[in-house]
């Protein structure tokens, strides 16, 4: 089967525990003349390469389709999650199906909706699945023959994946940290670190970003003028009774009831409103504050929190907090 636009007709993404089944699929496809990316077919080619970058390119740009073999093992693997994120970056860009789920079980995969059509592998042999993949490719070849010239003018520039890894001072993974990328034009992307301490972002425009990281048990982190062309690893150190939070427009601070709303006034000064919260012993609101200078808040239950704003732009605030003693 000829493939004029892609290096591979299909790439296979799977957990190692399912290799026996997937290998039979790969061998069956190969005998049919399908150009299939299967890792054991590529051992010599993969030898010595930066696999993080190379596999991202394969699953994002070099295959016409990817078959994602869903199983309970898939979510637990670092490499399969990297492959999935690369696939999804491509899927976001295109209006047609690109990720083809094949399910060993009902495991939920982030970003793969249950409403997406899938193949149930429970009573299907690897050879039968290979026939389905071949039929899918044949239909797609006809579509691209008639439509490629039109589609090529509609597809936007290639997005790419930017990944931030967050660890603590003991090199332990930090899960559920909020990460926000604020562009120099004040647009932003936001996400959270996953079970592997990773936050992935699909970057579609070439801009510099300020990277904000917050977690309820760790202090705030700010990196300014960051070019997302290379992934980064960030180490944060836990401190007692303190943490950080990122709020958009308004939000709550852990350890105190009520909401706060920082604003940029017409005179370019920063101020904050607090709902049912006293600021600095009951000063008038909005209360003017400065970045990197602490202010004291107290709620109606006597809970006290010391706040330090580290960043404010586009209604997004990065805040360190320290829990004081209740009165």
Curated annotation (Swiss-Prot):
Disulfide bonds: none annotated. The record marks 218 as: Important for ADPR cyclization. The active site is at residue 229. GO terms for molecular function: hydrolase activity. It catalyses: NADP(+) + H2O = ADP-D-ribose 2'-phosphate + nicotinamide + H(+); NAD(+) = 3'cADPR + nicotinamide + H(+). GO terms for biological process: signal transduction. InterPro entries: TIR_dom, Toll_tir_struct_dom_sf. Residues 10-120 are annotated as: TIR domain. It is an enzyme of class 3 (hydrolase). It comes from the Bacteria. The keyword Hydrolase applies. Its EC number is 3.2.2.-. Keywords: Hydrolase, NAD. The TIR domain alone is active and produces cADPR. NAD(+) hydrolase (NADase) that generates 3'cADPR, a cyclization variant of cyclic ADP-D-ribose (also called v2-cADPR). Also cleaves NADP(+), but does not cyclize the product. Homodimer. This is 3' cyclic ADP-D-ribose synthase AaTIR. It comes from Aquimarina amphilecti.
């Amino acid at each position: 089967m000829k493939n004029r636009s892609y290096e591979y007709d299909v790439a296979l993404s799977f957990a190692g525990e399912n290799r026996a089944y997937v290998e039979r699929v790969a061998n069956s496809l190969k005998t049919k003349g399908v150009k299939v990316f299967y890792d054991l077919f590529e051992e010599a080619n993969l030898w010595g390469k930066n696999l993080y970058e190379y596999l991202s390119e394969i699953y994002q740009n070099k295959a016409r389709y990817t078959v994602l073999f869903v199983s309970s093992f898939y979510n637990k693997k670092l490499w399969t999650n990297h492959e999935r994120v690369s696939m999804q970056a491509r899927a976001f860009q295109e209006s047609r199906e690109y990720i083809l789920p094949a399910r060993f079980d009902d495991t939920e995969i982030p970003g793969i909706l249950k409403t997406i059509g899938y193949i149930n592998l429970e009573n299907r042999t690897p050879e039968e699945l290979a026939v389905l993949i071949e039929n899918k490719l044949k239909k797609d070849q006809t579509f691209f023959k008639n439509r490629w010239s039109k589609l090529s003018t509609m597809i936007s520039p290639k997005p790419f994946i930017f990944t931030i890894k967050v660890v603590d001072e003991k090199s332990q993974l930090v899960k559920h940290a909020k990460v926000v990328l604020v562009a120099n034009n004040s647009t932003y992307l936001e996400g959270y670190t996953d079970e592997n301490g990773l936050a992935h972002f699909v970057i579609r425009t070439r801009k510099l970003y300020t990277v904000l990281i917050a977690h309820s048990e760790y202090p705030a982190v700010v990196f300014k003028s960051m070019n997302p062309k290379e992934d980064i690893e960030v180490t944060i150190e836990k401190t007692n009774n303190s943490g950080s939070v990122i709020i958009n427009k308004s939000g709550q601070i852990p350890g105190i009831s009520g909401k706060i709303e920082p604003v940029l006034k017409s005179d370019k000064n920063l101020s904050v409103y607090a709902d049912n919260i006293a600021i600095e012993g009951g000063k008038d609101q909005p209360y003017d504050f400065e970045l990197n200078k602490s202010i004291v808040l107290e709620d109606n239950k006597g809970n006290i929190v010391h706040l330090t704003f580290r960043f404010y732009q586009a209604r997004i605030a990065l805040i360190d907090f320290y829990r004081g003693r209740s009165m």
